[in-house]
Amino acid sequence: MKTSPRRRKHRRRTFRRLFWLLVLATLLLLLWPRRVTLDGLNSPHAILLRADSGEVLAEKDADSTIYPASMTKMMTALLAIEANPDLDTPVTLPEEIFPALQAQNASLAGFQTGETVTVRDLLYGAMLPSGAECCEALAREVSGSEEAFAARMNQKAAELGMTGTHFCNPTGLHDPEHVSTVRD
């Protein structure tokens, strides 16, 4: 049974319409904004931001006080780089920092008492193996003491609008007053 030219033309038109409708539907699905949820996330605190605008896409208890632990080292590294952009500057690890860190079972990068290394080495040691001795050495290099460096950390946090953050040390070792929020 042959189809008439009129019927074939109608089928082609119908096929084209269906094709373009499918293309349009696919584009709408791809471009339509979706609501992001954090329902399946195991963490009690989270925030998801757009990198280009800072817009909050989703959050979960983002303003609750938490202990920042090793996230502290990001502020330590930032201040060390700002204070000393020459990453090849030599720094000697002071003997007095090690006993307290070892007593607290702090994570160490493996540098030795009295060893002279560069600021770059200390930054790597602080950020990669989470070396507390590196953070202490950087703090003393930048501000002279852990306390003065913590004050500088709090000043920088205020400049950055981190209203829920208070630093007590450059390492992130536990202190009940060493706090932050995931929003900060």
Segments predicted by a language model, with ranges:
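N-terminal Lys/Arg-rich, disordered targeting/topogenic segments
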Residues: 1-15
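Structural motif marking the loop-to-transmembrane transition
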Residues: 11-18, 115, 119
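Hydrophobic membrane-insertion alpha-helices, especially the h-region
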Residues: 18-32
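Active-site-adjacent loops and short helices of periplasmic peptidoglycan-processing enzymes
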Residues: 30-183
